[in-house]
């Protein structure tokens, strides 16, 4: 069984089951994992709001879990999902939460829009 940290959470890495794109990184507590396994729909624990959250419940972009794996230490999960609706995963309306690239130039670090993500 997965190993939760001292806060009762486990990191969840989420990718698109079709093309493997990294969509988001979230956290699950025991209840979120149980609900995910029971329903086949991804549930997470919001650390900022301190509440359970069914991803896509408001937007209609539910995440149906196709496959769930754990790493060798059993302290991280990998969810391969199909996203319902028009497909965004990020609260900004983008497909992936990883749409910004960290670049370093001339000793300065900046965030830029990644060229492989929609605006």
Curated annotation (Swiss-Prot):
What Pfam families does the record tag this protein with? PRA-CH
Q: Which GO terms describe its cellular component?
A: cytoplasm
Q: What keywords does the record list, in alphabetical order?
A: Amino-acid biosynthesis, Cytoplasm, Histidine biosynthesis, Hydrolase, Magnesium, Metal-binding, Zinc
Q: State where the protein is found.
A: Cytoplasm
What residues does Zn(2+) bind to? 72, 90, 97
Q: Which residues are involved in binding Mg(2+)?
A: 71, 73, 75
- What name goes with this protein? Phosphoribosyl-AMP cyclohydrolase
């Amino acid at each position: 069984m997965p190993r939760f940290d001292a806060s009762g959470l486990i990191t969840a890495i989420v990718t698109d089951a079709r093309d493997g794109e990294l969509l988001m990184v979230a956290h699950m507590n025991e209840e979120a994992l149980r609900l995910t396994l029971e329903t086949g729909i991804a549930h997470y624990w919001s650390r900022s709001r301190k509440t359970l959250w069914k991803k896509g419940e408001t937007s209609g972009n539910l995440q149906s879990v196709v496959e769930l794996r754990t790493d060798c230490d059993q302290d991280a999960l990998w969810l391969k999902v199909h996203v319902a609706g028009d497909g965004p995963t990020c609260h900004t309306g983008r497909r992936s939460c990883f749409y910004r690239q960290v670049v370093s130039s001339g000793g300065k670090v900046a965030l830029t829009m990644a060229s492989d993500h929609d605006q």
